[in-house]
């Protein structure tokens, strides 16, 4: 929830590399302590203080002076900063008893906006001139009474990372560790293209703060009995707003001096705020008896979420031409708002939890063979329900539910076999509970059709035409229409009654062998099968089978089903399960050491064949439903994953040298990488533009679901009777 494209809840890694003592990657761990993930687990161990005071100071710079300034003989000038300043300091608080370690990192990145008006010096100059931009700006200020601001020439991203670790040795049997991390940052995000011009007001600031603290108590009760008690709390706050403020509308001019022009608050940032808090408790016992290591544990995770997300809260007006814009004549309009008129009343505020129990036995059968068997039970539940939409339940026969009680039983089996003095093999098979983005759960609490409603020019009530009142705030009649809208006359998201928490079944085999001449090799094979969570739409014009939408009986000439989704911005999308995506990966690594291990050459290859039903690349239901190509969006078939990298070759050469003494090595690293690109597939678009007309009505798609442009292209054969060529 609230993650950026990099996968972090921040602009860059929230972890200062100087704070890391060691890192491990587990793709398919046999241990039942690990769950609630999809691709794997990355673990970090932070550095702790010692009896000696030590510290470091660092500076990093990769600004414009480190970049080329010519492309095909043409010289470009631009301003770019990319700097980081950091320090670490650690030592004893009480010698042999208590220690501390502190890190701090401050980063700043500025990038030029790649598109700008003619003569601006931008890397890609557009056809629109600065004088024309100024004219549109003056029209906006004079006609509509607000300033769209000027042209953003740079974007800026700032972030500060702070971490503190304190270790306290209570006595010889009890050890206490406290960790604290704070990440604060913000960024200005701007857009542009050869055909689209964005005023600075159409960009947005994104502010982020993540605050994490944890405490761990490890106790040795006997030589064969160890306990761990762990508690952590993580809170995040994210804000998104236009530089022009939050009380300005969104304007879009389809043709102004040959460009599409965007002004005002981005429709997805007009009301967009997020606050989450995650509490995690873990109690674990480890007991050694004979050749067995028995582990038992209990975990409780609580997610507390507050999310405000209203699309186009202050209205979104489209104008066909600049003349229409100057005259105040819009061609389309839509808005969403809380029925009460108060933003806070539209917030999704709910809590859900994960309770886990596990038991595992690691058995040293012999000096060469170790076996692992474990079982883990995960239960997801919530006492909070979305606002009940009685009209939805009456229409479809079930309630617009949130996350109800759903559970999974995970079983893990593992084997480690030392074949001989130079080779061993590891085999793991197990089931793993998947990690679902909390935003998919939150959608059901945000879009219930009870607290938020929509209004558009396509279904405007008599006497309430917003097309001639652009930019003066939401007309009173629009606010009244939203307040009194029927309960089904809105976008509604829900979690299907049949939904079960998805899991993965994974087989992992790893073979390792030492080779002559200081070489070693590792070969890994992984095969997994994933049950997927994905969205389906139920207002298709066809009946349901329980809560499952049925396949339409009417088909297009190429055989794909025709859905009768005629509503605009009022679709009903549910989170369902479907089976199955599959992944098959093989990798091989060869390492060669030189100079007593101070120089290491590593060569590796990874190949994968990965299929999925839906990439689920977004946060909203409509984007997830329609952005991954399909023939039948409600009944998807496995296809090549949008994340697949079919082939990857990596070579690294690391060499240590001791210019400043044996305890201060300097490391040089050379890296080579070659890999396949991400998959692509041809699609066709059945929508002509923003006027609402389709090139063909054959597929019945609603463009607000993003599926009008994601239909996989039908490729006719010679003399194909389905096509007229």
Located regions from the model:
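Transmembrane beta-barrel strands of outer-membrane/channel proteins
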Residues: 57-63, 102-106, 178-182, 229-233, ...
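Transmembrane beta-barrel wall of Gram-negative outer-membrane proteins
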Residues: 78-186, 205-233, 376, 411
């Amino acid at each position: 929830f609230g993650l950026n494209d990099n996968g972090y809840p921040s602009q860059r890694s929230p972890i200062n590399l100087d704070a890391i003592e060691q890192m491990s990657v587990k793709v398919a761990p046999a241990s039942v302590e690990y769950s609630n993930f999809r691709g794997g687990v990355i673990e970090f161990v932070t550095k702790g203080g010692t009896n000696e005071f030590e510290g470091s100071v660092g500076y990093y710079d990769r600004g414009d002076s480190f970049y080329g300034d010519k492309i095909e003989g043409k010289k470009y000038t631009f301003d770019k900063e990319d700097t980081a300043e950091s320090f670490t300091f650690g030592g004893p608080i009480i010698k042999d008893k208590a220690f501390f370690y502190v890190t701090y990192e401050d980063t700043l990145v500025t990038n030029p906006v790649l598109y700008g008006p003619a003569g601006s010096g931008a890397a890609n100059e557009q056809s629109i001139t600065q004088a024309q931009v100024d004219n549109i700006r003056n029209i906006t200020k004079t006609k509509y009474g607000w300033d769209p601001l000027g042209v953003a020439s740079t974007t800026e991203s700032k972030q500060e990372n702070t971490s503190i670790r304190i270790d306290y040795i209570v006595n010889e049997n009890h050890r206490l560790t406290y960790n604290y991390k704070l990440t604060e940052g913000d960024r200005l995000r701007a857009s542009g293209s050869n055909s689209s011009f964005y005023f600075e007001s159409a960009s947005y600031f994104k502010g982020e703060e993540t605050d994490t603290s944890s405490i761990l108590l490890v106790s040795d009760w006997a030589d064969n009995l160890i306990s761990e008690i762990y508690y952590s709390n993580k809170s995040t706050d994210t804000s998104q707003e236009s530089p022009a403020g939050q009380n300005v509308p969104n304007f879009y001019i389809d043709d102004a001096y040959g460009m599409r022009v965007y002004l005002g608050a981005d429709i997805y940032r007009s009301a967009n705020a997020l606050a989450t808090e995650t509490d995690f408790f873990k109690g674990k016992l480890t007991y050694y008896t004979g050749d067995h290591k028995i582990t038992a544990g209990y975990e409780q995770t609580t997610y507390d979420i507050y999310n405000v997300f209203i699309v186009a809260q202050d209205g979104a007006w489209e104008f066909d031409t600049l003349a229409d814009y100057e005259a105040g004549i819009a061609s389309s309009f839509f808005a969403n708002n809380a029925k009460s008129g108060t933003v806070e009343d539209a917030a999704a505020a709910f809590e859900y939890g994960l309770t886990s129990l596990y038991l595992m036995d690691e058995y040293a059968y012999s000096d060469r063979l170790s076996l692992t068997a474990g079982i883990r039970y995960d239960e997801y539940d919530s006492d909070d329900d979305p606002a009940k939409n009685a009209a939805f339940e009456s229409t479809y026969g079930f309630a617009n539910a949130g996350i109800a009680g759903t559970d999974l039983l995970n079983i893990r089996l593992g084997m480690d076999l030392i074949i001989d003095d130079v080779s061993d093999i590891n085999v793991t098979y197990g089931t793993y509970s998947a990690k679902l983005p909390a935003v998919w759960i939150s959608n059901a609490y945000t879009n219930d059709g009870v607290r938020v409603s929509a209004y558009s020019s396509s279904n405007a009530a008599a006497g309430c035409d917003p097309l001639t009142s652009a930019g003066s705030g939401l007309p009173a009649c629009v606010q009244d229409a939203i307040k009194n809208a029927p309960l089904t006359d809105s976008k509604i998201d829900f979690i299907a009654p049949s939904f079960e928490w998805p899991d993965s079944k994974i087989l992992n085999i790893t073979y390792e062998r030492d080779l002559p001449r200081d070489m070693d090799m590792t070969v890994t094979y992984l095969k997994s099968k994933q049950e997927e969570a994905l969205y389906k739409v139920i207002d298709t014009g066809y009946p349901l089978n329980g809560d499952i939408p049925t396949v339409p009986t009417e088909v297009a000439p190429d055989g794909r089903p025709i859905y009768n989704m005629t509503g605009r911005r009022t679709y009903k999308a549910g989170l369902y399960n479907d089976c199955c995506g599959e992944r098959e990966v093989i990798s091989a690594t060869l390492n060669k050491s030189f100079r007593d291990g101070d120089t290491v050459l590593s060569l590796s290859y990874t190949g994968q064949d990965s299929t999925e039903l839906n990439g689920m690349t977004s946060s909203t239901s409509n984007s997830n439903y329609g952005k991954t190509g399909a023939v039948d969006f409600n009944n998807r078939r496995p296809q090549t994953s949008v994340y697949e990298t079919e082939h990857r070759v990596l070579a690294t050469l690391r060499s240590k040298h001791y210019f400043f003494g044996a305890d201060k090595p300097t490391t040089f690293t050379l890296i080579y990488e070659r890999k396949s690109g991400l998959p692509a597939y041809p699609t066709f678009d059945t929508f002509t533009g923003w006027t609402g007309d389709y090139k063909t009505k054959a597929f019945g798609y609603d463009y607000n679901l993003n599926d009008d442009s994601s239909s996989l292209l039908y490729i006719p054969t010679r003399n194909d009777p389905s096509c007229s060529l």
